Amino acid sequence: MKENFWSTLPRPFFILAPMEDVTDIVFRHVVSEAARPDVFFTEFTNTESYCHPEGIHSVRGRLTFSDDEQPMVAHIWGDKPEQFREMSIGLADMGFKGIDLNMGCPVANVAKKGKGSGLILRPETAAEIIQASKAGGLPVSVKTRLGYYDIDEWRDWLKHVFEQDIANLSIHLRTRKEMSKVDAHWELIEAIKTLRDEIAPNTLLTINGDIPDRQTGLELANKYGIDGIMIGRGIFHNPFAFEKEPREHSSKELLGLLRLHLSLFEKYDKDEARHFKSLRRFFKIYVRGIRGASELRHQLMNTQSIAEARELLDTFEARMDARSEV
């Protein structure tokens, strides 16, 4: 196996969770500017598309990264072991430092086809996928949930995953059925760690679910002795979630991150065409907590280009500056 970067990380380490249509190279660089985590994962990349002669072009943008993002982990999904084997070799050649297997996506058209969290119901296939993914020599990790239907599934399922000799297991502390509709089951962390210690003490344990920031993650790590913390939706409420010394951030700083996002979108659009509409989901992250925020968000949602968005920001910030001088 190539160098296992997981073994060199600080304890606890912090990861930005892979999120579909969110954690692309643009947003990862914005987060890095605000407060960098220890590890970045890509967006979800489908193994079948990657292995298809034509499909490879459709996933290229999902696998784009730069050297300053290392250690970079490719987050991939599917259900055919031979495709994971082929893709693992290709990802190693591309310079990724690790491969993370999606066994937790709850979306119906994924899970009900036996992929993502659907693999919880197909444990033997899950094991075959894990072993096949080691072909490229990269450390293999898994992101999953407590179970599919019921929380009581967690022990048998996680025991099975721990037995596969993986580098890291990230657990979203909910079942597939629960989606994100209930509080994450932090009460199970201690028992899960005990199981890990018994079955696979060399496998790192990362916790995910309802963790808003680094400080909360540190509290959980100190309380339970877990190795890593993964933050997902918390980044939407606070782009500075990974900040080591938290402080209040001004609206100017947030709008500055939005300007950076626009510039990076423009930069990487030259390499890989990106749809401007995909930017709209990010506006609410940066435009909030200030007078006129609702109106500005509404206006930004109706823009059709980077130039239009910048013009709106220029006008809005000029008004902000004028009010502050009164």
Curated annotation (Swiss-Prot):
Catalyses which reaction(s): a 5,6-dihydrouridine in tRNA + NAD(+) = a uridine in tRNA + NADH + H(+); a 5,6-dihydrouridine in tRNA + NADP(+) = a uridine in tRNA + NADPH + H(+)
Catalytic residues (positions): 105
InterPro entries noted in UniProt: Aldolase_TIM, DUS-like_FMN-bd, DUS_fam, tRNA-dHydroUridine_Synthase_C, tRNA_hU_synthase_CS
Molecular function per GO: flavin adenine dinucleotide binding; tRNA binding; tRNA dihydrouridine synthase activity
Keyword list, A-Z: Flavoprotein, FMN, NADP, Oxidoreductase, RNA-binding, tRNA processing, tRNA-binding
Binding site for FMN: 18-20, 143, 208-210, 232-233
Top EC class, one word: oxidoreductase
EC number: 1.3.1.-
Keyword Protease belongs to the record: no
Record-linked PROSITE patterns: UPF0034 (PS01136)
Pfam families: Dus
Gene3D superfamilies: Aldolase class I (3.20.20.70), Putative flavin oxidoreducatase, domain 2 (1.10.1200.80)
Cofactor(s) it depends on: FMN
CDD domains the record matches: DUS_like_FMN
Function description: Catalyzes the synthesis of 5,6-dihydrouridine (D), a modified base found in the D-loop of most tRNAs, via the reduction of the C5-C6 double bond in target uridines.
Family: Belongs to the Dus family.
PANTHER family (alphabetical): DUS-LIKE FMN-BINDING DOMAIN-CONTAINING PROTEIN, TRNA-DIHYDROURIDINE SYNTHASE
Name of the protein described by the UniProt record: Probable tRNA-dihydrouridine synthase
